[in-house]
Amino acid sequence: MKQLLDKDRFGPWALVTGASSGIGKELSRQLAANGINVVMAARRIDLLKEVGDGIEREFSVEFRAVQVDLSEEGFIDKIKDATRDLDIGLLVSNAGAARAGEFVNLALKDLHDQISVNVVAHMELVRYFAPRLVKRARGGVMLIGAMGASHGIPYMANPSATKAYVLAFGEALHFELEKHGVAVTVLAPGLTDTAVIPELFVDPGAIPMKLLSVAQVAAEGIAAIQANKSLCVPGALNRFMNRVVPASITRKMMAKLLKK
């Protein structure tokens, strides 16, 4: 795998949340391929250790697995304890929560949990690690958002609103932290081939575009933070659609495809 990331700038350790599967797992793998040790955080500790063992064998880096539920109050204390002795050069705040459905029918607890994971966790993680990165005068923060985050998606009203927060938060931080030598990138993928797709869509086969691979999403995200781009929308077609397709058309298309 081609080396894309400056490990002297973004290493020796990275923290990746939501690292047990999907984009987070692949980001952990590609960071390790660039010689960076990885703290992998998620709820499923057995799966984390399995993924970490594979990364350690393949790339000869170190890993540390942290079992944590980002929807729980006080989660940040577990992260602090797990990383206190490490020099974290890159925060990858990837974990997210989403459930499709008509807003009036969704459980209030699920809605609160989505905000806890998709908004509060990003904020608390950055608030803890950003001062340390500023003190280092190098490093980076990658926040995982979503393509079209500012549109507002029917049957994903709450999750899409939280992704709009991630976009605004990340682009503001990019401006604030750049002068301190800290890169900030919002990685905003479109529909990606992960286990989440069947959970959200009535018929994944009816999606009228090819799903992105996690490998492409991770690689473009890593290249973007190396270049300190404020926003990365992976895939040329997705970038084109993000620029030119009206939000009203996106809403209608997604409303037909998502589970109610």
Task: Report the location of each language-model feature.
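Conserved glycine-rich cofactor-binding loop
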Residues: 13, 20-22
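Conserved glycine-rich Rossmann-like NAD(P)H-binding loop of the short-chain dehydrogenase/reductase
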Residues: 34-51
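Residue(s) in the substrate-gating loop at a strand-loop-helix junction
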Residues: 146
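Active-site helix of classical SDR
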Residues: 126, 162
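Substrate-binding pocket helix/loop in short-chain dehydrogenase/reductase
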Residues: 102-103, 107-115
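Conserved NAD(P)H cofactor-binding loop of Rossmann-fold oxidoreductase domains
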Residues: 94-99
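C-terminal helical subdomain
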Residues: 186, 204-240
